[in-house]
Amino acid sequence: TYGMVIDYKSGGAHVTAQDVYYGLKLQLMTYLLALESAYGNTQGQSMAPAAVVYSYVKNPKIPAGAPLSYEDAVALAKESDAWHNSGYFSDDIELLTHIDNKFLSYGAKRGPYVPIATKKDQTISSRDLHKVKNTGEFDVMCRYTNHVMADIGRNIGDGQFPIQPYQLNKNRPCTYCDYNTVCRFDSSRN
């Protein structure tokens, strides 16, 4: 049995392994942990992940006139990466064809539901290998997410709220934070 987490977003959300490692984006993996736990508790068996993705809910500007056919909608989706799901997918090619039955027909162009390019031999293109995970890799990411969440919970329980915003390259969340006057984080000293 396989499960898939889909988090619908109106903006351009994406996740990287670095985001998960630094605890910046735990949402998809947290949802996967909850899904696996709920499935195990209700069904009495384990579930393997098929994918964890952000799916964009857009209201694209489409010329007025006749309704779009499925083929035309797919053509529009192919033209815009903004319509593509973003996240992690199983490395099982057959499973990916169950998510999108036309997955293999997109080849190097990537489809909207499984935006992973394939080579002529129907294996995953090297440029998209970072988007696929085997069951063990999903498990490691879930266990790590669980560990980070447990640490956060312990810190909250202990009354520990250190002012330690992340810095990734030169980016900090403080730039856009409405509460920087409350926390008094001074980037010139820290």
What are the functions of these language-model segments?
Residues 1-190:
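Structural signature of nuclease core domains in nucleic-acid processing machines
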